[in-house]
Amino acid sequence: MRPIRIIGTLLTLAAFFLSAATGAQEAAFDPDAEMFPVDVQYDARIPTPEQFLGRPLGAAPVRHHELVEYINKVSGLSDRLSVEVIGYSHERRPILFVVATSPANQARIDDIRTQHIALTEPDLRQSVTADMPVITWLNYGVHGAEASGMDASLPTVYYLAAAQGAKVDQLLAGSVILVTAVFNPDGHANRVAWLDTYGSRVVNPDPNNMEQDYDGRVARTNHYGFDLNRQWLSVTQPESRAWMRKWHEWRPNVSVDYHEMGSEQTYYFAPGIPTRTHPLIPDESMQLIADVVAPAEQFMDSQGRLYFHGDRYDHFFLGKGAGFPLVNGGIGILHEASAARGVARKTSNGLRTYRENILKHFRTSIANAEGALQQRDALLQFQKSFYDSASERAGNHSVKAYVFAAPGDDARLYHFVDLLNFHRIEVRTLAQDVTEGGITYRAGEA
């Protein structure tokens, strides 16, 4: 009988220690602590994304309706946030625009915007004042297949609403942070539907898994196959017209664009290839980018995460999210995470997870906002001097205006004028006939 009692005692002790060890492991894993800065207190009234979703971020993609419900929930609980629907996709999904700043700034947000825009109007002679906030724009999910960007908007909004302490108070007092979630709702919904259809609670990181065998080009675009990251100039789609209208209303100092790239890469953010910069982009822009991303570099270094600059991506095409701001008095910063494609994926560089990409995009979002605040005066002065210089060069240029017409094609003329007006380019109807290059442009028709 004694051996039986000893064995029973050992089994009991083993069960106890196993239970204790399991309990310790469960207590040690806190998804919120893993995702968010641990040296910050948070407003307990505001639910974390994990609490709201009922699962850790990255365990499954966030559906569009979940994002909308969460952002509206958090906005209703925080006096730091305001949210509005700025448009709808072709499939009738709303595009949300969040303004995050201090309660004091929220109370005078229209005045802040008006004063900021005045920096881009040389005739108004607006100077940079000591209390003028820097404007940071964060956009997520323009390529729907690159889904971690959209999911990163949830912890970003949570942090801006719930984080407490002097550091975040200073950030919100000195900044207006504009979050557009999500740029491409229909493309993202397409991608999420595939992941939910072929994914499983038992994660399979094999690249040959059906979950990852997806043609990303389908969800990269919007409902009608338009690449919305080539729409910053042409603005023919309802999604791009919605967020570009807001961009022009604010003319941000810093615009950050979040993407995913090939799974065998690490993590990229600007500045890009130095020899591939459009000649219209001021040299000072590249130095400002390097200064603003310094906190993002510090975060990546602090966690021992790999990243790179100056390769693969350039600053040449001006019709995308990281290019257009560079010729409009601000800076554009591209971020690219190596895609997990599903929840997890085996690569030659190790296991890539969806959650890891969400974390990196979220933490660099906050870091970029902090970098913008650190460079507030330089960014605002650069914006003012950019438009002052452009106005001076235009005044000294031999060409004062361009004349155009589209005889017999009123629709073509209408859409061209609409495009110019959308980008705040002044257009006037000819008051008298003008002959140029052997062509006569009739008054009222050109």
Where are these regions (language model features)?
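Aromatic- and acidic-residue-enriched carbohydrate-binding clefts of CAZyme catalytic domains
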Residues: 206-226
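Bacterial N-terminal signal peptides
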Residues: 8-19
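Active-site metal-binding loops of divalent metal-dependent hydrolases
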Residues: 142, 183, 260
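Short, conserved secondary-structure transition motifs
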Residues: 172-191
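Aromatic- and acidic-residue-enriched segments that line the glycan-binding/catalytic groove
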Residues: 191-205
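Positively charged n-region of N-terminal signal peptides that target proteins for export
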Residues: 1-5
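Intrinsic-disorder/low-complexity accessory segments
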Residues: 25-147, 151-176, 224, 230, ...
